[in-house]
Structures are given as C-alpha cells and as structure tokens.
Amino acid sequence: MSSVYTRPLARLIEQLQRLPGIGPKTAQRLALHLIKRPEADIQALAQALLEAKQQVGLCSVCFHLSAEPVCEICASPQRDNHTICVVADSRDVIAIEKTREYHGKYHVLGGLISPLEGITPEHLHIQPLIQRASQPQVEEVILAINPSIEGETTTLYVGQLLRPFVKVTRIAFGLPVGGDLDYADEMTLARALAGRREIEWQ
C-alpha cells in the first residue's frame, strides 16, 4: 500500500478490498467516508458486524442463512411443501424471494461442483436434499442454478440423483450464460421460474 496512506488507513483499505466487488478505488472511497463518520456510527457498524457473524448460522433444514435453528421460510405453514427450489447460495434465495412469485421451500447447496477448485459433491448439501426430496409430499424439485460450466455440472449431477423418485425441472434460461441469479432483475427471474421445464436427459 502506498505511503500516501497512514498505516491504520492503509490497513482499513486492504480489508475493504477483500470484500467481493470492492476494488482499490471503491475501498479508498469507503475508508475515507468511514473515518469521517462519528465514532458512535463506527461502533454501531462494528457491533452489527459482530452480532451478524455470531448469531447468523444455517437453517438445519434448508441451509439458508438463519438466526434460528429453522429459518422462517421452512417454519412457515403458508409455504408450499410440495415444491423445493434448489439454489447454490443464500443470495439466490433472496433474489427469488424478491420476485414474490415462488411460494415453495428452498434448499441451499452451499456452492457448485468444481473439480478445479477441489469442490466435490461431498462438500455440498446434496445428501440432505435427497432425503427431503424423497418425502411423499414433495412433488417437484426446481433446479435454479446459474448457467455456468460449474452450474451445468451441478444441475446434471443433482438431477440424475433425484429423477428416479421426483419430478425435476430447471428454470428457463432468460439468464445470460455464466450470470448470477442475484444479479438478474426481478422480472427476468420471475419469467425464468414461470417458464421452467423438465430436464432433457441424454
């Protein structure tokens, strides 16, 4: 880090740059903004970060982020128990929920199969998904996974495991190849869900 920054400011900028989507210039702007804020604001921010880290874990059913053992979606009697939407990350749950078009349950895999990065099926929440999907009330599993190489690998792998005992569909590709669900606008996501289709097996 350049000597134009004092050491504490340089450390702050370095830490901010470690956040996703934050480059050097954005990190600098954020750091300069933060040090101008009242100390009470900074303490409140630090406290919120600590509390979120300490109190937010994973739902024991679907593995979505939750401050309780079972998340609000899984615990809600208003949600449709006949459908499970499978996503890679909690960000995808949030993106789909914003559409207000899906009323079933979710299952968060916790990533995508990526041999190059050493991520195998055993690293993901696939076995709990199979157990949930094999329950008699489940009629459909929707695979809402990003259309990347890793996403396609994961979709086909999970779909093959599920197809013997439940209907498996995937969202329509109104999404760009390699695009993340959480970057798609709500209308595009809603259409992708509405236009879902069964996977064509080779």
From Swiss-Prot:
Q: Which residues form the Toprim domain?
A: 82-176
Q: Which GO terms describe its biological process?
A: DNA recombination; DNA repair
Q: Which UniProt keywords apply?
A: DNA damage, DNA recombination, DNA repair, Metal-binding, Zinc, Zinc-finger
Q: Which GO terms describe its molecular function?
A: DNA binding; zinc ion binding
Q: Which InterPro entries match?
A: DNA_Rcmb_RecR (IPR000093), Hlx-hairpin-Hlx_DNA-bd_motif (IPR003583), Rcmb_RecR (IPR023627), Rcmb_RecR_Znf (IPR015967), TOPRIM_dom (IPR006171), TOPRIM_RecR (IPR034137)
ZnF C4-type: positions: 59-74
Q: Which family does it belong to?
A: Belongs to the RecR family.
Question: What NCBIfam families has UniProt attached to this entry?
Answer: recR (TIGR00615)
The function of this protein is: May play a role in DNA repair. It seems to be involved in an RecBC-independent recombinational process of DNA repair. It may act with RecF and RecO.
The protein depicted here goes by the name Recombination protein RecR
